[in-house]
Swiss-Prot record:
GO terms for biological process: carbohydrate metabolic process; cell division; cell wall organization; lipid glycosylation; peptidoglycan biosynthetic process; regulation of cell shape. Its EC number is 2.4.1.227. The lineage of its organism: Bacteria, Bacillati, Bacillota, Bacilli, Bacillales. It is found in: Cell membrane. The gene is murG. PANTHER family: UDP-N-ACETYLGLUCOSAMINE--N-ACETYLMURAMYL-(PENTAPEPTIDE) PYROPHOSPHORYL-UNDECAPRENOL N-ACETYLGLUCOSAMINE TRANSFERASE (PTHR21015:SF27), UDP-N-ACETYLGLUCOSAMINE--N-ACETYLMURAMYL-(PENTAPEPTIDE) PYROPHOSPHORYL-UNDECAPRENOL N-ACETYLGLUCOSAMINE TRANSFERASE 1 (PTHR21015). This is UDP-N-acetylglucosamine--N-acetylmuramyl-(pentapeptide) pyrophosphoryl-undecaprenol N-acetylglucosamine transferase. GO terms for cellular component: plasma membrane. Pathway: Cell wall biogenesis; peptidoglycan biosynthesis. Its main location: membrane. Belongs to the glycosyltransferase 28 family. MurG subfamily. HAMAP family: MurG. Keywords: Cell cycle, Cell division, Cell membrane, Cell shape, Cell wall biogenesis/degradation, Glycosyltransferase, Membrane, Peptidoglycan synthesis, Transferase. It comes from the Bacteria.
Length: 356
């Protein structure tokens, strides 16, 4: 029986593709295990949503593009992570490793290479992240979500496969969503998602604008961990730090979304044809990948995008009003999108690429 090790973490986007592929592997009779960080969001997501598979925590350090004393400390964490991962891989003896990226994936990929375990990696963003750039040196193949990403990668290793969407995404139950929120079915719902880390500025602007927003919408506000404000209580407004199992039901009642610009989330909204206002992480918080993503989807006519540093209470309302006026056009543009690979087709490709 073929056994597959999965890795990836640090943000929801570095886990979501794995959450789609692991059930496919299990349904086809393969064994699966997960290697992630000790305290990252991937551990919480995997252990809660896929409790039937083994989760192995390893040491991991952050990879930085700038000079910092923390880099020296994290070198030792990465080295420890390689040893941790080797120990797991020698014990489990997987036939292949699938890496979704993120800092924790690098020591796992290096360990797999040292044991001659073929590795496939996945890049969701328009331009490759630092972790995947390093991991690619030790991997057999890299799959890309955007066709344009191939321009940044060696041709012999890179394949465009498009977005991989969770199977349960389209199975959200609107009745359950209304029951969960207590919302009125006859009024539009706005979902605000600041990403797995949250956005203090976006949260502040939403709360500042709440009375104006509630005139047009009912608002579901995913604030990010530790950023919920218990003092803000209004009819038609509900806050969560983070939603796991119920997210598909909330998406089923969502008419419009304000979101960070991680590509996995964007493709989910695109699949569900939910008009989106994208507020990407700025260059002060990231390498600019979300800015590239947001501009790409805005250029396609699937979304509107605004830089967080330009965002004000007035501009937010203005952008939402413009998007509502263009709702029909945006949704029609979204209808032109077609998924390149189903998760089953991608899984079959993985097995063929890794083991042949």
């Amino acid at each position: 029986m073929t056994k597959i090790a999965f890795t990836g973490g640090g943000t929801v986007g570095h886990v979501s593709v794995n959450l789609s592929l692991i059930p496919t592997a299990l349904s086809q009779g393969y064994e699966a295990l997960y290697i992630g960080s000790k305290n990252g969001i991937e551990r919480e997501m995997i252990e809660s949503q896929l409790p039937e598979i083994k989760y192995y925590p390893i040491s991991s350090g952050k990879l930085r593009r700038y000079i910092s004393l923390e880099n020296a400390k994290d070198v030792f964490k990465v080295l420890k992570g390689i040893l941790d991962a080797r120990k797991v891989l020698k014990k489990e003896k997987p036939d292949l490793l699938f890496s979704k990226g993120g800092f924790v994936s690098v020591p796992v990929v290096i360990a797999a290479k040292s044991l001659n375990i073929p590795t496939l990696i996945h890049e969701s963003d328009l331009t490759p992240g630092l972790a995947n750039k390093i991991a690619l040196k030790f991997a057999k193949k890299i799959y890309t979500t955007f066709e344009e990403t191939l321009n940044y990668l060696p041709k012999e290793k890179a394949d465009f496969i498009g977005a991989t969407i969770r199977e349960d995404l389209k199975n959200g139950n609107a009745h359950n969503g209304y029951q969960l929120t207590g919302f009125n079915e006859n009024k539009k719902v706005l979902l605000v998602m600041g990403g797995s880390l949250g956005s203090k500025k976006l949260n502040s602007i939403i709360r500042e604008n709440l009375d104006a927003l509630l005139q047009q919408y009912q608002v579901i506000h995913l604030t990010g961990k530790g950023l919920k404000d218990a003092q803000v209580k209004k009819s038609g407004y509900i806050q969560y730090e983070f939603v796991k199992e119920d997210l598909t039901d909330l998406l089923a009642i969502t008419d419009t979304v304000i979101s960070r610009a991680g590509s996995n989330a964007i493709y989910e909204f695109l699949t569900l044809r939910i008009p989106m206002l994208l507020v990407p992480l700025g260059l002060d918080q990231s390498r600019g990948d979300q800015i590239d993503n947001a501009n790409h989807f805005a250029d396609k006519g699937y979304a509107k995008a605004i830089d967080e540093e330009q965002l004000t209470a007035q501009i937010l309302l203005q952008e939402l009003n413009e998007m509502e006026q263009e709702r029909t056009r945006i949704i029609n543009n979204m209808k032109s999108y077609e998924q390149s690979y189903t998760k089953e087709a991608l899984f079959d490709k993985m097995i063929k690429d890794a083991l042949n």
